[in-house]
Amino acid sequence: MKHIRNFSIIAHIDHGKSTLSDRIIQICGGLTEREMAAQVLDSMDLERERGITIKAQSVTLDYKSQDGQTYQLNFIDTPGHVDFSYEVSRSLAACEGALLVVDAGQGVEAQTLANCYTALDMNLEVVPVLNKIDLPAADPDRVAQEIEDIVGIDATDAVRCSAKTGVGVPDILDRLVRDIPPPEGSPDAPLQALIIDSWFDNYLGVVSLVRIKNGTMRKGDKIKVMSTGQVYNADRLGIFTPKQIDRDVLNCGEVGWLVCAIKDILGAPVGDTLTLARQPAEKALPGFKKVKPQVYAGLFPISSDDYEAFRDALGKLSLNDASLFYEPESSTALGFGFRCGFLGLLHMEIIQERLEREYDLELITTAPTVVYEVETTAKETIYVDSPSKLPPLNNIQELREPIAECHMLMPQEYLGNVITLCIEKRGVQTNMVYHGNQVALTYEIPMAEVVLDFFDRLKSTSRGYASLDYGFKRFQTSDMVRVDVLINNERVDALALITHRDNSQYRGREFVEKMKELIPRQQFDIAIQAAIGNHIIARATVKQLRKNVLAKCYGGDVSRKKKLLQKQKDGKKRMKQVGNVELPQEAFLAILHVGKDSK
C-alpha cells in the first residue's frame, strides 16, 4: 500500500496533459518504443482529429524512484474542456493527488482554476507543474507568481518541464512520490470498490473501471452491486498499462478494470459501489453528485427504420458518458426520436458525431434550448426543456430563465472587447479583479446566451486568450417569448425557438432570411413566416420556378397569351393547395448558427 500513488492530471485545454502522460508512460516503460504514439491515451478517433481529450483514461505504471524503491503509479488523464468537467470530477474522486499542469507561456486560465478548486474541495494534494518551458515565449517565473496570486498554491518550487522534449519529467515523478500521500483503507476490511467509469464492449459486455477503496477483489469472486443488490461473477479483472492486462487480484488502493458479463447497460451505474456477496460492506461509498444537463436538443434518425438501433446506441453511449440524459420524443415534422440533455454545445456535437460514427446512424438535431422554469396561472411550476412543451401565452403567470455564473480570465488588453460581448449577451457584471497583467471577470449571463455561441465569440474577440468556466446559478424572471416558424401557413414544431422579446424581432427576421436561402425553389411560391402567438413578425417568400408558356407564340393575338398565362396561374394555385415542402437537413443545422456569422 505504501508504494501506491493515485493521481490525475488536470489542466486547461491545450496545456499539454496528454503529451505529459505520453512521457510518463515512456519513462516508466509502459509501452515499447514501437507501440508509442503521440497522445497514446486519446484512443477515440474523434479525440485524435480534434486534438482534444474527451474521455478520462487510466494507466497503471511501475516507477523505480531514485531511492531505489519501486512505486506503482495509477494515473488518470482528464479532459480540459468545460463541457467535460464531470469526467474530471469523477477521475479526481479516485485519486489522492493531482498534477496541475500550467503552460509556462500562457499562464493560468479559467479551467485551470475550476479544476484546481474541484481538487482542493476533495482534499487532494495539488502539485503544480510548469510545462512547455522549451517555448521561446515561456516565462516560468511570471507564471509561478500568477499561480500563487490567482490559484493560491505555493508554486515557487514548482517543477519545470517540457513534456514535448522530455526535460524535467523525471523530476515530476520524484515530486509525485514525495508529495502525494499513499491511499488509505484496509486490505482486510469488506470490499468497497467505486465505479469510476463504464463502457460497453461488444464481446465482453459492460467493462467497468474501479478504484478499490477497502478490501481486495479476486477473479471468480461473487460481486454485488450495492444500489441494485444484484450479484455477478467477476470473470476477468486487470489493469491498463495502456494495454489491457489480465490479473488475478486487485489490491486495496489500486485502480483497475473489471468484467462481470453484465449484459444490461444499467447493471453497473457510474458512481456505484461494488462489494462481495458473502461479506458485504456496511454502507456504500459516497458517489458523485448527479450532474444536471444544461442544454437540451431533439435528436431524430433521418429514416424512421433506424429508431430501434438509435435507442440501443444511446443506451450504450450513456453508459460510457454518465452525463448524457435522454427520453423519447415525437415531432410531427421529424417523426420519432429522443430529447437529449447535454452539458454544453461541444458535448452535444461530440455525442452526435460519436453516434454517427460508432453506430452508423444519420441524425437530425433540432435547435438547442435550455431549461426554463414556468409558473402557470394555475400556480403550478413546470420545467420546460423544449419550445413545443411551452404552455400557451395566456396560461403563463411568469417565465424564469436559467442564469449562469461565468468566470473569465484574460489579458488586460482584451478587457474592453470581452465586456462589450458580455453586455450584448445581456450579462451583468458581479466582480472584476486584476492579477498583474491578467484580469478575472465574473458575469451573470443567461444560460441560453452562453450555450449558443458565447465560447466561440469569446475566443474570437480575445484572439484566443480569454478562457471561460461557467456553472448554473439560479432561475430569474425574464421576458421570454416563443417564436414559431410557419412554412406555407403550417407551423413546423421542430423549428420553434424561445428567445428574449428584445431580440425576437431580429432573430425572427434573420431566421426567415436564412431559411429563404436554404429551401429549394418549388413550382409555387412558399411563404416563410416567423410568429409570436398569432402575431407575424417577419416574412420572406421563396419565388416559384415558372416555365415560359409564351415561348411557342410568335406574334399572334394577345388574348391567346392571356389564356396561356391564366391557365398557368390556375395550375400553380391548385399545386399550392396540395403541395407540401420538403425541408433539407441544412435548414435545421442553419438554425443552430443563427446569430453566429451575422454580428
Swiss-Prot record:
GO terms for biological process: positive regulation of translation. Disulfide bonds: none annotated. Its EC number is 3.6.5.n1. It catalyses: GTP + H2O = GDP + phosphate + H(+). InterPro entries: EF-4, EFG_III/V, EFG_V-like, EFTu-like_2, G_TR_CS, LepA_C_sf, LepA_CTD, LepA_IV. It is found in: Cell inner membrane. GO terms for cellular component: plasma membrane. Keywords: Cell inner membrane, Cell membrane, GTP-binding, Hydrolase, Membrane, Nucleotide-binding, Protein biosynthesis. Pfam families: EFG_C (PF00679), GTP_EFTU (PF00009), GTP_EFTU_D2 (PF03144), LepA_C (PF06421). GO terms for molecular function: GTP binding; GTPase activity; guanosine tetraphosphate binding; ribosome binding; translation elongation factor activity. GTP binds at residues 14-19, 131-134. Belongs to the TRAFAC class translation factor GTPase superfamily. Classic translation factor GTPase family. LepA subfamily. HAMAP family: LepA. Required for accurate and efficient protein synthesis under certain stress conditions. May act as a fidelity factor of the translation reaction, by catalyzing a one-codon backward translocation of tRNAs on improperly translocated ribosomes. Back-translocation proceeds from a post-translocation (POST) complex to a pre-translocation (PRE) complex, thus giving elongation factor G a second chance to translocate the tRNAs correctly. Binds to ribosomes in a GTP-dependent manner. This is Elongation factor 4.
